[in-house]
Amino acid sequence: AVEMPPKPTDRPLRLPIQDVYKISGIGTVPVGKVETGILERGKTVVFNPSQKAAGVKDIEMHHTSHAKAEPGDNVGFNVRGLAANDIRRGDVAGYGDNEPMFVRHDETFVGQVQLMDIPKAIGVGYTPVFHAHTAQVAVRFVELLENSKTKEANPAFLKTGDAALVRFQPTKPMAIEQMDAFPELSRFAIRDMGKTVAAGVCMKIDKK
């Protein structure tokens, strides 16, 4: 029999939010899939980058109520004291003792990126849309650090087929994690002109 890898239940909670519903008589219900850790009824979760906190009143899966949810579970959970527009798709829920990481619009992160289908050579200033977990954020290329293929430092531009280390700056706060901390939430795809042009991972976040 094929052994399934153990679920990452012993790691801090990370739950990317796919949608947020306002349900009459119940309140605000974020929906998403647990990536790591355990979501528990009665605990307080923090949503980043919205930076809102709320108690978990109930957890629902397949129309039944549960006390907890584990990695791989798709859940809706009812939170106390938050309006539906306080949080949004692209937020990640975690606990206060290990909050989900996010990069503000005045901060940067370094990513290792593979360019698959870029229409023309790109350089500093290129600002396509990054898709990371459930977030979609326009992100600017602020520094080309190295062409990983040719080992050239600070290349002037990059083209299809290149791999590179790039410093990125999101145009608005964006939840993303470092590869060494949460590989599940470090990956991103880059889309432009309606197609995926590159893929990468976040290596290092530079917080201010």
Task: Give short role names for the model-derived ranges.
Residues A1-K120:
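Conserved catalytic-core segments of large NTP-driven translation/proteostasis enzymes
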Residues L82-K208:
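C-terminal effector modules of nucleic-acid-centric enzymes and ribosome-associated factors
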